Amino acid sequence: FIDKVSTDIYELDRGQICKYEGKFDYYLEKKAERQQQESVSLAKAKNLYKKELEWIRRMPQARGTKSRARIEAFNELKETITAPTPTKSAELTVKAQRIGGKILEINNINKSFGEKQIINDFSHIYKKGDKIGIIGKNGCGKTTFLDIITETIKPDSGKVTLGQTIKIGYYTQNPPAEKSDTKVIDIVKKISEHIQLADGTAMGASQYLTHFGIPPYKQHTHYGNLSGGEKRLLNLLCILISNPNFLILDEPTNDLDIYTQMKLETFLEQYQGCLMVVSHDRHFLDRIVSQLFVFRPEGKIKEFPGNYTD
């Protein structure tokens, strides 16, 4: 969307506005270069600060003009190294449970609402590593399809068979209700206080929430004080840390800011389980899926190898 309607990108970053002349990919490239330059400059400033700090400690009192100027420069240097820095885009992939030989089989399912055919005789056998995007017009039956897969509703005919080792994590557009006076961090800790990552390490619940855009002060507020978008983000993160090996996501990027969405994209790119996602975001689908289910009129679902651009 940004590429089609804009020629320049302005970013508000740590109280400053940075201009990037070009498309979104150009912005990402130049932003990474700028952050790299900032990291080098910050490292040099920290080394100089250590040397100047030793001088400050040795100087009992600044009497001369040169000494006072050096102290002023030291104070400016201190402000530089203590200023906010850009958040590092760490790559955090939750450890998925083991997947057995049988994952999910859909056999000749049909679903109608009244005279409207939503799904017409669809079959599919899922394989390890499948990452499938689901696209179609609003109201064509995409969410109904996910509800059938997760056994939230039943098909009119046909069968869905889930493998014994499969644990589904289902993200819907309507998060489950939590008590309004429950703290955000307690909701997460109820699932797990330490999140097991794919590389064998673990991360505290608070640190994981911070990475995905829920800062510490928000973690200790009550659930009832969150906005609708914040509640959906919290629900998504709770699903991710429950270690599912089959993720089913219905419009997961709605209400996410661009940086949280980029972190989610990185997470899903590295995700080792199976994935099925409904989204209208073409860029998002291009990054994470390798196959599409395209909903056609009269309940027909066409399988297409490739991403949205393909």
Locate the predicted segments by residue:
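A general structural signal marking secondary-structure boundaries and capping sites
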Residues: 60-63, 78-81, 85, 195, ...
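Active-site phosphate-binding and catalytic loops of NTP-dependent enzymes
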Residues: 82-89, 158
